[in-house]
Design a protein with these regions (language model features):
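A nucleotide-sugar donor-handling region in carbohydrate enzymes
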Residues: 1-54
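Hydrophobic/aromatic beta-strand patches that form the interior of the parallel beta-sheet core
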Residues: 5-8, 19-21, 76, 91-93, ...
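Short loop/helix-cap segments at secondary-structure boundaries that form the rim of catalytic
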Residues: 10-19, 81-90, 121
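Active-site regions of enzymes building and remodeling cell-envelope glycoconjugates
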Residues: 16-27, 87-96, 147-149
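Donor-nucleotide binding loops and adjacent catalytic segments primarily
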Residues: 33-108
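Nucleotide-sugar donor-binding patch of glycosyltransferase catalytic domains
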Residues: 91, 123-163
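A donor-sugar binding/catalytic signature common to diverse glycosyltransferases
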Residues: 97-141
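C-terminal alpha-helical cap of glycosyltransferases
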Residues: 158-162, 171-192
Length: 192
């Protein structure tokens, strides 16, 4: 039997039984101030998120290179389980299961161009820079949609300083709400 609906968490046009509800992003009940306290962020904070593999190590290397220009800020790294090393003047949170909260607490996000991370930054209005893995077409497309290319890594310090001046602009992605409405309506119609 064909299913009633296929729910896809991306923007786009519905067709037949396919419902595109928009991104589904985790939410937090804590305020930004509570989260900053929870993570001990006391200065303006630049979050560097490199994903779960070593593919994003180039971002950390670049941040280490430009560190002297960023000395007045707190630099925090979120990485996969494979990167457990300690860095001087950089806080390495390692692997976290609440990246959305760390993104919300940060003042600027520097990240690979993964779709979920982009959506979480938009949800919480965190100014962000997305550098794709070179040759990874999906990340390159995602980054380009946000106005970035791999070569932007060469002006990362300049971009970070620009982004620190940007106002937060949260955008409720709404996907979870739309998906739950479709499911509730389906359950209600099958109970009658």
């Amino acid at each position: 039997k064909k299913c009633d609906y296929v729910i896809i968490p991306e923007d786009g046009v519905d067709e037949d039984n396919i419902r595109r509800v928009g991104p589904i992003v985790r939410k937090t009940k804590q305020s930004r101030e509570e989260l900053r306290e929870k993570f001990s962020f006391t200065k303006k904070t630049i979050l560097v998120a490199i994903g779960g593999t070593d593919a994003g190590l180039f971002l950390i290397e670049k941040v280490l290179e430009i560190l002297p220009k960023l000395s007045e800020f707190e630099i925090v790294i979120v990485s996969g389980p494979s990167l457990s090393k300690k860095f001087e003047k950089i806080k390495n949170l390692g692997f976290v299961n609440n990246l959305h909260e760390v993104i919300y607490a940060a003042d600027v996000l520097v990240s690979l161009a993964g779709k979920s991370t982009i959506d979480e930054a938009k949800q919480y209005g965190t100014p962000a820079i997305f550098i794709p893995i070179r040759g990874h077409f999906e990340q390159e497309d995602n980054a380009q949609e946000e106005g970035f290319v791999f070569e932007d890594i060469e002006r990362l310090d300049e971009l970070i300083l620009q982004k620190l001046e940007e106002k937060r602009n949260p955008h409720d992605m709404g996907g979870a709400q739309k998906a739950s409405e479709i499911i509730k309506n389906l359950l209600n119609s099958s109970n009658h």
